[in-house]
Amino acid sequence: MAQARRLVLFWYRAYNQMMTDFNAKTRLFVDMPLVAQQRVTLPDAHRHYLVNVMRLAVGAPLTMFNGHDGEWAGHIAEISKKQCAVDISMQIKSQINCLDLWLLFAPVKKARLDFMAQKASELGVSCIWPVRTDYCRISRVKDERLAANAIEAAEQTERMDIAAIREFTGLFSVLDQMENDRLLIWCDESSAGSPAHNIAVALRAAPAHYKAAILIGPEGGFSPSERKQLTGRKNCLKISLGMRILRADTAAISALACY
């Protein structure tokens, strides 16, 4: 009888811990395998975030995802000066990936670039690709900064995959690498095409596609040679974002929201 009582108490406590883990408010991206009933040791950066920023202690619940295995519930099992260990209890969500949608853009200044990467990730792009155009004023882009913004946005919005970050590349090279069946949505600031409220209509009239890329140009627009290349490209849809010339970050959000 005593043994049965202890067994019931054990499962009762285990069930309560699982329910606590399931209702966790802290969500963390980790670059490691996630398996039920396993203990994982987090990198020091994660330990610092959980302990010093979030002020979590041993026993605190959290959820984790790695971008391809769904979402998992767990709790902090151990904290030391050098590491933080988490016990994984169970998978609570199956993996769901966003649409195969790329954002190609001429980079802008740092603060607006951070904003663009965050919002693009929140809106579900699968790839963030800064492109070098003839009139681009930025000469260098920090890939790791874009990646950090994409991860933070995914953590906050319950997205389960992470937008891929591609290296800063010339526009013509990007176009050469793009598949022919990927619809290129060219946001042309000088276009006399669809006004802002008809972008969705223009997209519905576009060729059938299951993957696409949205192209946003620099503040100075596209050069004549770039326009010639884009105009002659197969499977390219030129659209207007309205009567006004939008900043690159505003244009990106507008186009993504309409897709």
Language-model region placement:
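N-terminal positively charged helical leader segments and presequences
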Residues: 3-93
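Short, ordered loop/turn segments at secondary-structure junctions
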Residues: 33, 91, 133-136, 243-244
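RNA substrate-binding interface of SAM-dependent RNA methyltransferases
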Residues: 93-186
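A mid-sequence, solvent-exposed acidic-amphipathic segment
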Residues: 171-207
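Short, acidic/turn-prone active-site loops that include or flank metal/cofactor-
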Residues: 191, 219, 243-246
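A C-terminal functional module that forms or caps the active site or interfaces directly
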Residues: 212-229
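Structured adenosyl-cofactor binding patch, chiefly the S-adenosyl-L-methionine
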Residues: 224-259
